[in-house]
UniProtKB/Swiss-Prot annotation:
InterPro entries: Nudix_hydrolase, NUDIX_hydrolase-like_dom_sf, NUDIX_hydrolase_CS, NUDIX_hydrolase_dom, RppH
CDD domains: NUDIX_Ap4A_hydrolase_plant_like (cd03671)
Species, as recorded: Shewanella sp. (strain MR-4)
Residue span of motif Nudix box: 38-59
Annotated GO MF terms: mRNA 5'-diphosphatase activity
Name of the protein in question: RNA pyrophosphohydrolase
Alphabetical keyword list: Hydrolase
A Pfam family it matches: NUDIX
Organism lineage string: Bacteria, Pseudomonadati, Pseudomonadota, Gammaproteobacteria, Alteromonadales
């Protein structure tokens, strides 16, 4: 769905774990990383689109997550001119996104990047909460900053465990 201003309706998904980290995924065959996201189909609510995209992109079902919150409004970003397809009608100049913050209830092993048969991502990892703001492609950075700021209190308050630290083995001489 592209609105009269040329923005495609889209949902963004931030999945957090019990350590306050967020899931960060690498786009298939590329070097760019981002949060899962995808378009809203005609007749679909933003929440329905989020659950569909959640399964298509990372293999998680509603029972694997809890919705903690969503953005109060739609956030927009413009695509760089080189990415705008002028030959498509209507022309899409960017995305307007409703974001959802989810808490993972299941084990990491429930994440399956190949669940749809057409993977969007080829790798993923847990990163610190603010890491994505500095790492996402530049044209999405302002939206990431806004959504992360809006979700920060909620996301970081659901940290239920400390991140396990690797034990350093001490050498003995003797």
């Amino acid at each position: 769905m592209i609105d009269s201003d040329g923005f495609r309706a889209n949902v963004g998904i931030i999945i957090c774990n019990r350590y306050g980290q967020v899931m960060w995924a690498r786009r298939f065959g590329q070097h760019s990383w981002q949060f899962p996201q995808g378009g809203v189909d005609d007749g679909e609510t933003a929440e329905e689109a989020m659950y569909r995209e959640l399964y298509e992109e990372v293999g998680l079902r509603p029972e694997h997550v809890t919705i903690l919150t969503s953005t109060r409004s739609w956030l927009r970003y413009r695509l760089p001119k080189r990415l705008v397809r002028q030959d498509s009608k209507p022309v899409c100049i960017g995305q307007k996104q409703k974001w959802f913050l989810l808490q993972l209830k299941s084990q990491d092993s429930a994440i399956n990047l190949s669940s749809s048969g057409h993977p969007e991502f080829d790798d993923w990892r847990w990163v610190s909460y603010w890491y994505p703001v500095r790492q996402v492609v530049s044209f999405k950075r302002d939206v990431y900053r806004k959504v992360m700021k809006e979700f920060a209190v909620t996301a970081l308050s659901f940290q239920t465990q400390e991140i396990p630290r690797k034990r350093v083995r001490q050498r003995t001489t003797g």
